[in-house]
A protein has these predicted regions:
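Mixed-charge (Asp/Glu-Lys/Arg
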Residues: 1-126, 131-134
Length: 134
């Protein structure tokens, strides 16, 4: 998968500056959703590929008798409603956003292997959350 930043058009600097305890400036971003199917598809593709590359899904689901959507929802993604799935989903989403910020806004290279190698879908992956190289 070629990682792109096209999905980030909804993430916009709002012009506010906050300051940390040690007086360092912090830019504030807002998630500004607009009804745009192409951007929504870009978000879906971007997050989906963290768990299972589009180029790999058919090989991985072979023999399961599951559709692509069923494979992702039953095997790869954290559960949508059964605990701790929702909190794991939220944490994963936040980590992906921070990784995207580091990579696409600050110019770091951020490896994207954390979720594709998950062995238990409803658990956080052990180890460092995010690492970026400049």
């Amino acid at each position: 998968m070629d990682w792109t930043s096209e999905h980030l058009s909804w993430l916009v600097k709002n012009g506010s500056i906050l300051y940390s305890v040690d007086r360092k400036p912090i830019e504030v971003f807002e998630f500004r959703y607009t009804k745009d199917d192409s951007i929504m598809s870009a978000w879906a593709r971007h997050f989906r590929n963290h768990y299972c590359l589009d180029s790999d899904i058919d090989v991985l689901r072979h023999g399961t008798f599951l559709s692509r959507a069923e494979y992702l929802n039953k095997i790869k993604f954290p559960d949508q409603s059964k605990a701790p799935g929702p909190s794991i989903r939220a944490g994963d989403f936040g980590e992906v956003l921070v990784a995207d910020y580091l990579q696409y806004c600050l110019g770091y290279w951020v490896p994207r292997t954390r979720y594709v190698n998950k062995t238990v879908r409803n658990e956080s992956t052990k180890g460092s959350d995010i690492i970026g190289f400049h």
